């Protein structure tokens, strides 16, 4: 059956002026104007209005038909119109003339009185279910399976229900929310209704007014006169969108939320504090704290339980006041899905979305009368609007201040807990112990500690991602294209080794000056990865992991590794060399190998170390022995220091153990007399003294290397200093006539000079150039250079490095050439000057002097590079002492020698060792092997990464805003923080 749209005003005209069916029954019926049915046709109609004359009584058998009311969900009841209805319209007349006959029988009256209420309602035609839901703008019925609908966007077929049962639109709506959220949000915002009018009748329903006669009038909208309807359209032009939606008032004059057909009725009181997130339909934003709270997974059931728990936990005062004022305590349960009128308002930026915006009476009614509406809504769960801040504004401000203080205190406690986990590596279950819970109850009774699962799965990973992002953003701003890496493997697990990669660079612009006014720190470093590898991992696995980290961190920022520093692990060394990288041995590991070999070579030293370890073990494991030792120290007024334990494989811990025994030798000797089986002979005490004296320079060198301002420029001077110190000790022992000590000194000196790794470092190009570029040592280079090394040759190599940089950076080439044009004419007659003169006259260097120098543009740049290097060596330097960072000097030369400065930064920024991981994996750190075994493997990698980076990154924990909502969500602030 075809359909049409009729606009029907309510009138109080007497029944005689209308057809008898309307006068007797008071029931509105309609027949399509395009229908040619005869009087035997039975027509079905859907009604949503009351008859105008409620006093008229129906026959007994039809009394139940009197009037229709909306109860609960809106129900469209079908009424079968009797054949008498067709006869009263006039037998033999076309059905299309029926409305005209009705209109002719009505008295003439003002047209505006017929639309006084201007509140529209929909009446549906027979045998047609109106597609009032806006989801049908995105779907069409599947022609093959009528119980399914096909999405117009993705062409996916979605079920509407079981065949033969009720077919709804809830599944279609959830599909749009999950798969096409932007389209669905936009449709809700602008209230799309085009294409639905063919299924509806517009029934204007208003309360009786003195100017209205209460008559019914049928006007088919297909043939309506535009001039006749012009006044009404002009009147409602400003509210065109709202006029297309059904509006009504509750009889108690409390504004009811206008609901979108097919959407969830927001009857819960929590929506007075939330609005739907426009970007994420499955989340809601709190109006008080502006936090986004999840309502459920996208595409699944979206409830309000989490929103209510958020209010109870974070804003208990507002929630309690709202419940008290509205009497709606417990109204925060999940809403039931309903179908209602299709009404939605546009929202301005900054306002709540349509799903949570309350409509006022002025928005819903354009009537000039003050009489209550005649439309009654019964048995519907009304949701009065609780207002949280209707009381005194001063009290409301005090409550907001109190809530803000409570939230700030809770955030500080939460940040402190995460800081303890990361920096001290406390196990997660430590905070769940009853003792800590009692402590927390005393300190912060209102604070609720999240579960350990939250820290493990959300807090630590989010902090981990934040720190990684900061490091990556910092690497984007690195000026030099060449940086350096350190690669180490540390063992603290029976089956797993930890592979650590650290990046090092120099930033002359962002140097942070210490508070005490010392030397600024230009050297920056960050740990890139902490990866667990199996004990039996191959060289290819290490190389693959190294290449992965380079591709992840360096390649996107156009950075290349210049040198890679590592220990003497054969797998790591072979992996670095196999990947084509330049390997630099770790200086501390080289010293450790030399001293460990020195211990093993002398049997007397080994026996002395065994007795010393037993002595320390006796005092560390016996409480009574420590008490006796401390009492003896106190009785003789001797200073007491904590016992130092020896760590296998590290000579520095052995040195500190021997030093502690010598400092407490008098007390230890008397205390050991009472203990059986632990004896240190006088010869061993004497040998211990010799060993400590010999190792003292090595301990000083180790402390020197551990300083953050040291680089490859210290390798040659430190080796020279060690050899010189051993020579002075030999002379002292020779004067004193101590043969045993002389033999020990000679043995260690020989090992230091003949060690393969140290010898390779002494002759390596990068160590020599780094020493040349340190202004502290440029005037005494002959003392540091190994035998057979020519200073002029390395000056030439340095000039070639500067020339290469000029060729790759034309800007630096122009500055250097213009500023060094003068010195080319005023060159001396030394060997290095002759190279420059030969280059200037012939355009290229002699093959014996510069075999690797290219011709062409490079040959034209070489004279300028040679001039810059010669000017650097001729400059007198007395501003800084040998203990200061040479980068301070080069910071002042950036504008004078830009190319030479960049080459100097490249060599001076390379570290001598990986002291960062050395400090992490030692007995003095908080890193305990037992703790690793009890933790998750992947998470312990993140904890080590954070512990090593947080202090260096200077992360501000106050920027980590943690909200313990029911889903334990943590929100990291969007501010991007850059490394200092």
Curated annotation (Swiss-Prot):
The UniProt annotation puts the region (HATC (Hobo-Ac-Tam3) domain) at: 868-950
Keyword terms of this UniProt record: Cytoplasm, DNA-binding, Metal-binding, Nucleus, Phosphoprotein, Repeat, Repressor, Transcription, Transcription regulation, Zinc, Zinc-finger
Entry GO MF terms: DNA-binding transcription repressor activity, RNA polymerase II-specific; protein dimerization activity; transcription cis-regulatory region binding; zinc ion binding
ZnF locations on chain (BED-type): 130-187, 265-322
InterPro entries in the record = HATC_C_dom, RNaseH-like_sf, Zinc_finger_BED, Znf_BED, Znf_C2H2_sf
**Residue ranges, compositional bias (Acidic residues):** 360-373
Q: Name one Pfam family in it.
A: zf-BED
**Highest taxon of the lineage:** Eukaryota
Effect of gene disruption? Increase in body weight of mice at 20 weeks of age, at 23 weeks of age only female mice show an increase in body weight and lean mass as a result of an increase in muscle mass. Increase in the weight of kidneys in both male and female adult mice with an increase in the weight of the liver in female mice. Decrease in plasma insulin levels with an increase in blood glucose clearance and increased reliance on carbohydrates as a fuel source in male mice. Increase in serum IGF2 protein levels in adult mice. Increase in expression of IGF2, PGAP6/TMEM8, and ENHO in skeletal muscle.
Tissue and organ distribution: Expressed in pancreatic islet cells and weakly expressed in surrounding exocrine tissues (at protein level). Expressed in muscle and brain (at protein level). Shows broad tissue distribution with expression detected in brain, stomach, intestine, heart, kidney, liver, lung, skeletal muscle, ovary, spleen, tail and testis.
Q: What else is known?
A: Encoded by an exapted DNA transposon located in an intron of the Zc3h11a gene.
What's the protein here called? Zinc finger BED domain-containing protein 6
Q: Which organism is it from?
A: Mus musculus
């Amino acid at each position: 059956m075809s359909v049409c749209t009729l606009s029907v005003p309510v009138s109080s005209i007497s029944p005689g002026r209308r057809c008898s069916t309307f006068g007797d029954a008071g029931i509105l019926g309609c027949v399509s104007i395009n229908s040619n049915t005869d009087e035997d046709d039975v027509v079905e109609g859907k009604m949503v209005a009351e008859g105008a004359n409620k006093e008229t009584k129906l026959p007994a058998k039809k009394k139940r038909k009197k009037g229709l009311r909306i109860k609960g969900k809106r129900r469209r009841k079908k009424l079968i119109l009797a054949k008498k209805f067709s006869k009263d319209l006039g037998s033999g007349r076309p059905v299309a003339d029926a409305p005209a006959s009705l209109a002719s029988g009505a008295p003439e009256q003002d047209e505006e009185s017929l639309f006084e209420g201007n509140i529209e309602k929909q009446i549906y035609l027979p045998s047609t279910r109106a597609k009032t839901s806006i989801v049908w703008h995105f779907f069409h019925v599947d022609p093959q399976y009528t119980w399914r609908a096909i999405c117009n966007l993705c062409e996916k077929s979605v079920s509407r229900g079981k065949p033969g049962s009720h077919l709804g639109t809830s599944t279609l709506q959830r599909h749009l929310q999950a798969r096409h959220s932007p389209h669905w949000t936009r449709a809700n915002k602008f209230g799309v209704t085009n294409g639905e009018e063919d299924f509806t009748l517009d029934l204007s329903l208003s309360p009786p007014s003195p100017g209205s006669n209460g008559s019914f009038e049928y006007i088919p909208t297909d043939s309506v006169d535009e001039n006749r309807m012009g006044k009404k359209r002009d009147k409602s032009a400003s509210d065109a969108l709202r006029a297309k939606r059904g509006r009504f008032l509750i009889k108690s004059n409390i504004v009811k939320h206008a609901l979108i057909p097919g959407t969830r009725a927001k009857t819960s009181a929590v929506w007075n504090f939330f609005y739907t997130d426009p970007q994420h339909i499955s989340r809601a934003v709190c109006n008080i704290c502006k936090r986004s709270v999840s309502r459920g997974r996208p595409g699944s059931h979206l409830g309000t339980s989490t929103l209510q728990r958020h209010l109870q936990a974070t804003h208990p005062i507002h929630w309690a006041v709202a419940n008290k004022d509205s009497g709606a305590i417990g109204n925060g349960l999940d809403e039931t899905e309903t179908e209602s009128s299709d009404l939605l308002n546009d929202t301005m930026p900054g306002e709540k979305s349509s799903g949570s915006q309350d409509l006022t009476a002025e928005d819903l009614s354009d009537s000039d009368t003050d009489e209550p509406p005649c439309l009654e809504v019964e048995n519907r769960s009304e949701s009065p609007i609780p207002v949280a801040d209707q009381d005194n504004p001063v009290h409301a401000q005090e409550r907001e201040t109190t809530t803000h203080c409570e939230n700030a205190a809770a955030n500080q406690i939460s940040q402190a807990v995460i800081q303890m986990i990361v920096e001290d590596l406390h196990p997660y279950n430590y905070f769940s112990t009853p003792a800590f819970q009692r402590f927390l109850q005393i300190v912060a009774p209102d604070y609720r500690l999240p579960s350990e699962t939250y820290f493990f799965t959300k807090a630590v990973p989010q902090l981990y991602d934040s720190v990684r992002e900061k490091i990556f953003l910092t690497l984007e701003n690195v000026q030099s294209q060449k940086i350096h890496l350190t690669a180490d493997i540390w063992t603290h697990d029976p089956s797993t080794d930890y592979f650590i990669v650290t990046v090092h660079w120099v930033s002359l612009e962002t140097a942070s000056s210490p508070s005490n006014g010392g030397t600024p720190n230009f050297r920056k470093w960050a740990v890139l990865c902490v990866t667990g590898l199996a004990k039996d991992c191959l060289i290819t696995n290490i190389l693959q992991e190294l290449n992965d980290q380079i591709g992840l961190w360096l390649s996107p920022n156009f950075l290349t590794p210049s040198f890679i520093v590592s220990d003497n692990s054969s797998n790591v060394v072979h992996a670095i060399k196999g990947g084509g990288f330049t390997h630099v041995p770790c200086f501390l590991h080289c010293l450790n190998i030399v001293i460990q070999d020195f211990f093993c070579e002398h049997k007397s030293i080994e026996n002395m170390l065994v007795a010393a370890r037993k002595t320390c073990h006796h005092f560390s494991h016996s409480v009574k022995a420590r008490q006796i030792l401390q009492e003896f120290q106190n009785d003789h007024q001797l200073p007491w220091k904590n016992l130092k334990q020896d760590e296998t494989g590290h000579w520095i811990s052995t040195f500190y153990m021997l030093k502690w025994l010598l400092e407490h030798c008098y007390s230890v000797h008397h205390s050991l007399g009472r203990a059986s089986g632990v004896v240190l002979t006088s010869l061993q005490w004497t040998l211990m003294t010799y060993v400590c004296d010999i190792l003292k320079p090595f301990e000083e060198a180790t402390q020197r290397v551990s300083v953050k301002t040291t680089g490859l420029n210290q390798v040659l001077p430190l080796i020279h200093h060690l050899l010189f110190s051993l020579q002075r000790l030999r002379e002292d022992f020779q004067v004193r006539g101590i043969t045993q000590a002389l033999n020990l000194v000679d043995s260690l000196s020989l090992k230091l000079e003949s060690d393969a790794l140290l010898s390779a470092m002494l002759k390596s190009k990068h160590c020599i150039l780094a020493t040349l570029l340190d202004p502290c040592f440029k005037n005494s280079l002959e003392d540091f250079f190994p035998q057979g090394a020519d200073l002029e040759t390395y000056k030439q190599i340095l000039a070639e490095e500067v020339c290469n940089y000029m060729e790759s950076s034309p800007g630096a080439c122009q500055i250097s050439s213009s500023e060094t044009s003068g010195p080319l004419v005023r060159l001396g007659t030394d060997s290095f000057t002759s190279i420059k003169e030969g280059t200037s006259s012939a355009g290229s260097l002699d093959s014996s002097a510069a075999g690797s120098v290219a011709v062409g543009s490079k040959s034209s740049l070489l004279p300028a590079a040679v001039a810059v290097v010669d000017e650097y060596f001729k400059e007198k330097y007395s501003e800084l002492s040998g203990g200061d960072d040479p980068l301070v000097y080069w910071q002042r030369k950036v504008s004078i020698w830009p190319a030479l400065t960049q080459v100097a930064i490249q060599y001076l920024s390379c570290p001598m060792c990986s002291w960062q991981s050395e400090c992490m994996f030692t007995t003095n750190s908080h890193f305990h092997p037992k703790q690793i075994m009890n933790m998750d493997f992947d998470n312990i990698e993140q904890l080590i990464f954070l512990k090593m980076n947080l202090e260096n990154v200077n992360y501000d924990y106050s920027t980590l805003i943690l909200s313990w909502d029911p889903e334990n969500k943590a929100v990291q602030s969007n501010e991007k923080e850059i490394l200092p």
